[in-house]
From Swiss-Prot:
PROSITE patterns: FBOX. It comes from Arabidopsis thaliana. Signal peptide: none annotated. NCBIfam families: F_box_assoc_1 (TIGR01640). It comes from the Eukaryota. CDD domains: F-box_AtFBW1-like (cd22157). The lineage of its organism: Eukaryota, Viridiplantae, Streptophyta, Embryophyta, Tracheophyta. GO terms for cellular component: chloroplast. Residues 1-46 form the F-box domain. Pfam families: F-box (PF00646), FBA_1 (PF07734). This is Putative F-box only protein 11.
């Protein structure tokens, strides 16, 4: 058989679509292939092509769950817990991790943040946290300085306190977030898009707003409103689509009707997003038979996470628990519906249910996070 040398541009295009768990095995093929892992353009292009996955932990293991739409079926991978650079006496809190641009940020029982790429098996640890947070999110400013926002509601009033940690700079700021009594930040999970945080809030008239927090200005603001009203029985979940748009799931607990909303245009500029500039479209409305009911409180994240297929926005993946506390994945497109049990799931020793998080696998190295040795 005669070998054919493909144009290098075509090779890059093909490799951009290979999942990272497979791609890392190809590093030894040749020096040119290995060099792609240091090519920022290739890493970013690969990240845009990557399909979202789910990540969760049991009592002793941590798993990723990929959806193969041929079938469809799920593929569960156990991630190594022997994390390089992590001392055995310093266990990370595997239920406390957030995704930001393909990196997992994990808080720990010891004072610090572990930055982890499970597919590259690379970590970086920053001992910059002076108390461990209750609720936190990760983003970065216009200089690509990663920061952590630890926020909590104050008892007795509507104010929201926050601590902003500059990861790697060994500094923190304690400040009051600008807020009022007309909205709540805890009506959905938060997501990070281009370094800025977004979440859904509800005003006293049950109008739904998307709030944002810029790590450049260190101020929250109303990003836009949504074209429907909120109901106390509904569950909201926010997600990032194709790294440049926001989507919102609105589940009616009474009818099990699910509506998916999507921003019509890309959100490219992190400082621009006036209410009149953001247009939402109702992407789909689905009704899943025997879909479980949910409870949601301000101090808890929704017991539901979801994402849209990068290659087909009309294909929806939802992960949640049923009434027996068993975890399932629901795959929906039009009239097609499939429910798949996650066999590896188990209730934790404290009888709590582990949270499922959406995670986009990447080739991003933890070393991209800047560090300043000034104390």
């Amino acid at each position: 058989m005669v070998s054919v040398n493909l144009p290098w541009e075509l090779v890059e295009e093909i490799l951009c679509r290979v999942p990272p768990q497979s791609l890392v095995k190809f590093r030894t093929v040749c020096k040119q292939w290995n060099s792609l892992f240091d090519d920022n353009k290739f890493v970013n292009d690969h990240f845009v092509q990557s399909q979202p996955q789910l990540i969760f932990r049991t009592e002793s293991k941590i798993y990723s769950v990929a959806v193969n739409f041929k079938g469809p079926r799920i593929e569960v991978h156990e991630l190594p817990l022997a994390i390089p650079g992590l001392k055995s006496e310093m266990p990370i809190r595997l239920h406390d991790y957030v995704d930001c641009d393909g990196l997992l940020f994990c808080t720990s029982y010891f004072n610090g943040v572990l930055i982890w790429n499970p597919w590259l098996r690379q970590t970086r640890f920053f001992p910059s946290i002076h108390r461990y947070p209750v609720t936190y999110d990760i983003g970065y400013d216009n200089k690509k300085q990663y920061k952590m926002l630890d926020y909590y509601k104050c008892e007795g009033d509507s104010s929201i306190k926050s601590i902003i940690y500059e990861i790697g700079l060994y500094s923190k700021k304690v400040k009051d977030l600008e807020s009022d009594s007309t909205w709540s930040i805890f009506q959905s999970n938060s997501v990070s898009l281009n370094g800025t945080l977004y979440w859904a809030g509800v005003d006293v008239n049950n109008g739904i707003f998307i709030r944002s927090f810029s790590f450049s200005t260190e101020k929250p603001r109303t990003f836009c409103s949504l074209p429907f009203m909120y109901d106390d029985d509904n569950v909201l979940a926010l997600a990032v689509f194709r790294k440049d748009r926001l989507s919102l799931l609105n589940l009616c607990n009474k009818t099990s009707e699910i509506k998916i909303w999507l921003t019509k245009n890309n959100i490219n500029d992190r400082e621009v997003g006036l209410e009149e500039d953001v247009v939402w479209i109702n992407l789909m409305t689905v009704l899943i038979p025997n879909f479980p009911k949910f409870s949601f409180y301000w101090y808890n994240r929704p017991d539901l996470t979801y994402f849209l297929d990068n290659d087909d926005a009309k294909r929806l993946v939802i992960c949640c628990y049923d009434e027996t506390d068993q975890a399932y994945i629901y795959i929906v497109k039009g009239d097609m519906f499939k429910k798949i049990k996650i066999d590896q799931y188990e209730v934790l020793s404290d009888y709590s249910r582990p949270h499922f998080h959406t995670y986009i696998p990447s080739l991003v190295r933890p070393s991209r996070v800047k560090e300043d040795n000034k104390n």
